[in-house]
Design a protein with these regions (language model features):
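Second-shell loop/turn segments in exported
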Residues: 92-102, 122-131
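N-terminal mature-domain "stem" immediately C-terminal to a signal peptide or N-terminal signal-anchor/transmembrane
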Residues: 10-64, 240-242, 246, 250, ...
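Extended, charge-rich intrinsically disordered regulatory tails
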Residues: 286-291
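Post-HExxH zinc-binding segment in Zn-dependent metallohydrolases
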Residues: 127-159
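Classical Sec-dependent N-terminal signal peptides that target proteins to the secretory pathway
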Residues: 1-11
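Active-site scaffold of zinc-dependent metalloenzymes
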Residues: 55-100, 117
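Active-site recognition of the HExxH zinc-binding catalytic motif
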Residues: 105-121, 134, 138
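Long, well-structured alpha-helical subdomains associated
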Residues: 146-277, 281-283
Length: 291
């Protein structure tokens, strides 16, 4: 099902998840929206609207999977909690990234969680960890963007958003899907992504080739990111986690270039001991502005 701009403006919508459907409800009309669920599904969800709102909190969206022959789950959207921009402090300067199409991208990410369950049900994935859920959901977002937007721009926006989130706080490391998105973006052109008729076809091709970060690696990246972007006064340790700096540099370069421009991004990386004067600054960002 292709969701039009008009459809996205309403507070209730059914969307396809394979052979099943998911109900999309906005929090502003949650109670009447939930009435569209059969009792067998409703009983799998929190008992009342206030409890659902409490679980959602300040998030812009949330998905709840259910066990049913025709319904895959419930997606809650809170448009007023979706950010229009993100800002981060880089060496004393506040820089910002405007976020576009957040309603669609957020919805596609939440749908991606249900699609991840489908991959497991089909046997394509044996086990789903919480981190796998997040990067699979972002891979679905990327595939959906290619199919409907015919552009890599919104995928790069999601990539940059994930980086800025961890720059702001490593509490969001569970959603840092950049190590996977970077592989997807380097492996496939826009036309190649479009050529995959289904998400499962894309993942059947991508999964055997993915290099998945181990939990220990993610913990080390988290520590290095915290030290690099913390606004606290910390003891200078220029060689801290030096073995992780080349990979982190490659993950951050596109976002830093988007925020600062190429020359300033290169200067910042040198300042942070992630780039030396003899290193080549390889990441050109023309593909980020592709619309």
């Amino acid at each position: 099902m292709i969701l039009s701009a008009l459809a996205l403006s309403v507070s209730l919508l059914w969307t396809d998840i394979g052979s099943k459907q998911a109900l999309i409800c906005e929090v502003s009309s949650l109670q009447p929206c939930l009435h569209h669920l059969p009792s067998s599904v409703r009983h799998q969800l929190p008992a009342n609207v206030s409890e659902l709102n409490q679980i959602l909190g300040q998030r812009g969206a949330m998905v709840m999977a259910v066990e049913d022959s025709t319904i895959a789950g419930l997606i809650l959207l809170s448009p007023e909690n979706l950010p229009g921009s993100l800002s981060v402090n880089l060496s004393g300067s506040i820089v910002s990234l405007n976020l576009e199409n957040q309603h669609e991208l957020t919805l596609w990410h939440e749908m991606g969680h249900l699609e991840a369950n489908r991959l497991q049900d089909s046997g394509l994935i044996d086990e789903l960890t919480p981190y796998m859920h997040e990067w699979l959901a972002d891979c679905y977002l990327a595939w959906r963007v290619a199919q409907e937007k015919r552009s890599l721009g919104p995928i790069w926006q999601q990539y940059n958003r994930r980086n800025i989130d961890v720059m702001q706080s490593v509490d969001t490391m569970s959603h840092w899907t950049v190590p996977i998105l970077s592989q997807l973006l380097s492996r496939y052109s826009l036309q190649e992504l479009i050529a995959f008729e289904t998400f499962s076809e894309l993942m059947s091709d991508l999964l055997p080739q993915l290099e998945l970060p181990a939990p220990d690696s993610l913990a080390e990246f988290s520590s290095l990111i915290h030290r690099t972007f913390s606004t606290e006064v910390l003891q200078p340790l220029p060689n801290y986690m030096s073995w992780r700096k080349p990979a982190l540099r490659s993950y951050l370069e596109p976002t830093l270039t988007k925020l600062l421009g190429e020359e300033a991004a290169e200067h910042w990386l040198i300042e942070q001991k992630m780039l030396t004067g003899n290193d080549v600054f390889p990441m050109k960002m023309s593909h980020q502005v592709e619309l």
